[in-house]
From Swiss-Prot:
GO terms for molecular function: ATP binding; proton-transporting ATP synthase activity, rotational mechanism; proton-transporting ATPase activity, rotational mechanism. InterPro entries: ATPase_V1-cplx_f_g_su, ATPase_V1-cplx_fsu_bac/arc, ATPase_V1_fsu_sf. It is a peripheral membrane protein. The gene is atpF. This is A-type ATP synthase subunit F. Belongs to the V-ATPase F subunit family.
Amino acid sequence: MRIGVVGDSDVAVGFRLAGLTDVYEVKSPEQASKAIEELDNNAEIGLIITTERIGEGIRETIANAKKVIVEVPDKNGPIVREKDPVKILVRNAVGIDIK
């Protein structure tokens, strides 16, 4: 299983330096959607990481993806949300609510 990444230039450089090879540097929501779809259709990819800000612009693409997509903060910090998507993923997968 490999990890795919969709992010801006700073995120892409960071993950490449960490040794990941399936890294897409995007500049628009359209590019991000296309990259997510390509990674989602790649049988070797098991997890996709993107930034919260990119995720905000491609919510429908993320909702339709078959793979697990984790949104991480970018260099500007986290987006304050009413519901934490990671907590929702864990609750749905494990059945336990994280406090």
